[in-house]
């Protein structure tokens, strides 16, 4: 081997070491770790696509099509959010909707797998009635309201849509109703009374059973 080849080999090794010291190619491992962490974070949530619509816009050169997706994301333990994504492709629209839903997370007050009290949610022309149910009842809901309740982790509930059957209106009405729920402790503090004076006996028993489990 000639002296020039040896020097060329040493130069290549030095260049590789310089790149590694500067964090050039070895950064790929860090990027992969970040991607894996983001993927694990997404996998721990429940995602439901309620509806996908195609939207067309008339321009000078013709029509431009895009897609909108209504997505619900929850952890199944009381956290849920709704997002609306728009993109030129369906997967991108779903991804944007899921990201927006995670930004809109809110906590649903529950006792022993059901909501704390009856409530009625309204949004635009959508009206949804929600009532607590006994253990073992299941999620008695149809249409677009069921995915919201399932992603939130509600196990027993009675739900009925009283207004527009439009999926977007039903979802937002369901979310509006869930956001109006309050815990019995909050009601007791607001009225200046004890929890036993405010909450029904059946709710207190269910609450005690849930804490014991």
Curated annotation (Swiss-Prot):
For this protein, the record's Pfam families field holds:
Ribosomal_S5 (PF00333), Ribosomal_S5_C (PF03719)
Q: Can the keyword Ribosomal protein be found in this entry's annotation?
A: yes
Any single biological process term in GO = translation
Q: Name one GO cellular component term.
A: small ribosomal subunit
Annotated Gene Ontology MF terms? rRNA binding; structural constituent of ribosome
**Keyword tags:** Ribonucleoprotein, Ribosomal protein, RNA-binding, rRNA-binding
Superkingdom to which the source organism belongs: Bacteria
Q: Which SUPFAM superfamilies match?
A: dsRNA-binding domain-like, Ribosomal protein S5 domain 2-like
The ranges of region (Disordered) come to 1-42
According to the UniProt entry, the note on domains is: The N-terminal domain interacts with the head of the 30S subunit; the C-terminal domain interacts with the body and contacts protein S4. The interaction surface between S4 and S5 is involved in control of translational fidelity.
Family assignment? Belongs to the universal ribosomal protein uS5 family.
Subunit structure of this entry? Answer: Part of the 30S ribosomal subunit. Contacts proteins S4 and S8.
Matches recorded under HAMAP family: Ribosomal_uS5_B (MF_01307_B)
What is the name of this protein?
Small ribosomal subunit protein uS5
Annotated gene? rpsE
């Amino acid at each position: 081997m000639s002296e020039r080849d040896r020097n060329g080999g040493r130069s290549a090794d030095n260049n590789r070491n310089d790149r590694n010291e500067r964090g050039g190619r070895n950064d790929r491992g860090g990027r992969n770790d970040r991607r894996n962490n983001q993927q694990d974070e997404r996998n721990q949530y429940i995602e439901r696509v309620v509806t996908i619509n195609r939207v067309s816009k008339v321009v000078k050169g013709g029509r431009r099509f895009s897609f909108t997706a209504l997505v619900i994301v929850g952890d199944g333990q009381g956290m849920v959010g709704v997002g609306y994504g728009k993109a030129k492709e369906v997967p991108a629209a779903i991804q944007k909707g899921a990201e927006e839903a995670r930004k809109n997370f809110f906590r649903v007050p529950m006792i022993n797998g059901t909501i704390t009290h009856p409530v009625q949610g309204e949004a635009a022309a959508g009206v949804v009635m929600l009532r607590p149910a006994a253990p073992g009842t299941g999620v008695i809901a149809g249409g677009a309201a069921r995915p919201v309740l399932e992603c939130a982790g509600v196990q027993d509930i009675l739900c009925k849509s009283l207004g527009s059957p439009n999926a977007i209106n039903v979802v937002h009405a369901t979310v509006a109703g869930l956001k109006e729920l309050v815990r019995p402790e909050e009601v007791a503090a607001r009225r200046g009374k004890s929890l036993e004076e405010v909450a029904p006996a059946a709710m207190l028993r269910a609450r005690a059973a849930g804490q014991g489990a």
